[in-house]
Amino acid sequence: MVGITCNVADDKGHTASASTNVTIVEPPPPPAPKTQALCSISFATDKKRPTRVDNEAKAFLDEVALDLQRQADAKAVVVGESTDAERAITAKQEKVAAKHKKAVVEQFAAQRGLNAKDYLVTEKGIDASRVSVATGSTDGQTVEDYLVPAGATFSSDVAGTTPVDETTVKVEVRKPLAERHPAHKKAAAAK
């Protein structure tokens, strides 16, 4: 509390005085930072390679990389999603893998997220420790990207996600198309 007193006088010799007490209240603290949803990337267009990062996905991930470069203390979380049909395939493959050690188990949601992270790290130069991968429970062939500012907690802001053990899922290596044999080119040109 602060006491304030005012005294005034005019040119005719009149005076006046007033006093008051003012309570100064501290302003409320700023709201805690929250996780921001950035974009949703669809992987439904390529039926043969449903976890591949295509050019459309790269455009979205380029924006994510720019956001991370603008906010050096922020992190990103990439949440891969899969369809019910893909989850059924994974469950079936896991049963086979329990009996056969060399059996392959496709984890579509984790693979999508890991491929998106790999693009951010290898192509855009984002530090791998700033990008986390998780899987979600939404039905779809998508990846949801989130920006987590310093002081925010992803797990409390976004429910229904599970962190991915990146040692159990491998990044899908991009393979260039095989070069066509010259005889095939001539046959195609002759038609």
Where are these regions (language model features)?
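Periplasmic peptidoglycan-binding/tethering modules of Gram-negative envelope proteins
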Residues: 1-76, 89-98, 126-129, 136-191
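Short, conserved glycine- and acidic-residue-centered signature motifs
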Residues: 54-57, 105-109, 113
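Short acidic, S/G/P-rich loop/turn micro-motifs used as interaction or catalytic elements
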Residues: 83-88
